[in-house]
Amino acid sequence: MEGTEKGRHSQSGQPNDMKRRENDMKEHGMENPMDLGAFSISLTVKDLAASQAFYDKLGFTTMGGDAAQGWLILKNGDHIIGLFQGMFEKNMLTFNPGWDQNAQPTAEFTDVRELQRRLKAQGVTFMTEADESTTGPGSFVVVDPDGNPVLVDQHR
């Protein structure tokens, strides 16, 4: 749809919620909203091959991973699912700073340690933390109020 991505407008031509939020934050002297990077859902699976076959039927194709190590990344359009056998206890929302939805590096991104500092300043409790004395790859996990883990995993 024309103007949807670039201008972030709804079908009615009005700015969407994200644009309104950006404007509200700017008016109050706050930084831009957090750019968490590419979004996917990471699913714990009992049988990687059976899960892959199921999601193939929904139009997903394998774009990465290593079945021998128990994980695959599947894609359908802009939608990404990670299948993980024996790696996680629960399904997780996953964000990858520095990547776009095609797992390609973005020109600019907010480092995972900066995201962590911002969330700590807002009182968010962490399940795991990125080592703030390092650079490059790092990750942290927070848990939402309903117990859903959210992984922020930077690969570069």
Where are these regions (language model features)?
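Vicinal oxygen chelate
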Residues: 2, 8, 46-49, 87-88, ...
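N-terminal beta-strand motif that seeds the catalytic metal site of vicinal oxygen chelate
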Residues: 2-7, 13-53, 155-156
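Core segments of cupin and vicinal oxygen chelate
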Residues: 35, 42-87
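Structural motif
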Residues: 38-40, 90-92, 149
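Short hydrophobic beta-strand motif reused across regulatory alpha/beta modules
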Residues: 61, 152-153
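Residue-level structural signal for beta-strand termini and adjacent loop
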Residues: 68, 86, 132, 153-155
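Short hydrophobic/aromatic beta-strand element in the GNAT-like acyltransferase core
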Residues: 71, 80, 92, 139-141
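Short, charged/polar, Gly/Pro-enriched secondary-structure boundary elements
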Residues: 79-82, 146-150
